[in-house]
From Swiss-Prot:
Disulfide bonds: none annotated. GO terms for cellular component: cytosolic small ribosomal subunit. The keyword Transferase does not apply. It holds the Pfam family Ribosomal_S9. NCBIfam families: PRK00474.1, uS9_arch. This is Small ribosomal subunit protein uS9. It comes from the Archaea. Coiled coil: none annotated. GO terms for biological process: maturation of SSU-rRNA from tricistronic rRNA transcript (SSU-rRNA, 5.8S rRNA, LSU-rRNA); translation. GO terms for molecular function: RNA binding; structural constituent of ribosome. Keywords: Ribonucleoprotein, Ribosomal protein.
Amino acid sequence: MSQQSQVIITYARRKMARARCYITPGKGRVFVNDIPLEIIPMEVVRMKIMEPLLLAGEKISSSIDAKIYVEGGGVMGQADAARMALARALVKFTGSKELEEIYKVYDRTMLAGDPRQTESEKWMRYSARRWRQKAYR
């Protein structure tokens, strides 16, 4: 009977973006929507997704393979959701309270999330808050 490999699955949301992260023991490869992380064109997005790996250290990041699937929302919302899912997966994979504490001190939203949503547009207005100017005379 073959030994089943350990797979950790986590889920995260940011604004309208949703991300699922699958972590398995491996060689340190990270894929976002089946594209290697190294060839993602926007450097800001690439660095944001890499933050949990850099904080975890070379030993942990080189011993796992991560596949992140992101959908919905905009580019930075997707990056934040992917970062959060990856950080949660690394904490779950290692079972380390120290790593969890490092993430909380660095940026609490890596684990806890950010519940803010965009405010919806109201009727007879141009946007959520903007309205026609009122004239008194």
